């Protein structure tokens, strides 16, 4: 893997956004499990989890503004995102029945596919497959891939 000093500006931006996406999924999980609000979790990530690489092992370098836009966007649009994700699931499944981490991935990635048209759909899908692979080794990444593929083809048919 390239180090930050050897990265091109576009590679650096992609790496920082990838970290922001992973952090946004973690933040949504923390909000749900811990019952915390978006402002508190965003503040906690900014103060205790983000930082220059090497400061401390628990710090991660991420695009903090992108992270905040994802978390705040999901919270703001959750009433639209959840039904959209529900519609992609099999008849007997609902978002609330899924694992909390899968739910967080679907919410953040779904928000990005539906409302962040500045990011190509294929990039969004690939990024959240990587996020899913960071958490799961089983069928979950394939399930998430299929859901996002259906979502993207419905929301952005011109990109396929």
UniProtKB/Swiss-Prot annotation:
Q: Which InterPro entries match?
A: NusB-like_sf (IPR035926), NusB_fam (IPR011605), NusB_RsmB_TIM44 (IPR006027)
What's in the keyword line of the UniProt record?
RNA-binding, Transcription, Transcription antitermination, Transcription regulation
State any GO CC term: cytosol
Which cysteine residues pair off into disulfide bonds? none
The cross-references to Gene3D superfamilies, in alphabetical order and at most eight, read: NusB-like
Q: Which GO terms describe its biological process?
A: DNA-templated transcription termination; transcription antitermination
Q: Which GO terms describe its molecular function?
A: RNA binding
Tell me its family. Answer: Belongs to the NusB family.
Query: By its UniProt entry, which NCBIfam families does this protein fall under?
Result: nusB
Describe its function: Involved in transcription antitermination. Required for transcription of ribosomal RNA (rRNA) genes. Binds specifically to the boxA antiterminator sequence of the ribosomal RNA (rrn) operons.
Protein name according to UniProt: Transcription antitermination protein NusB
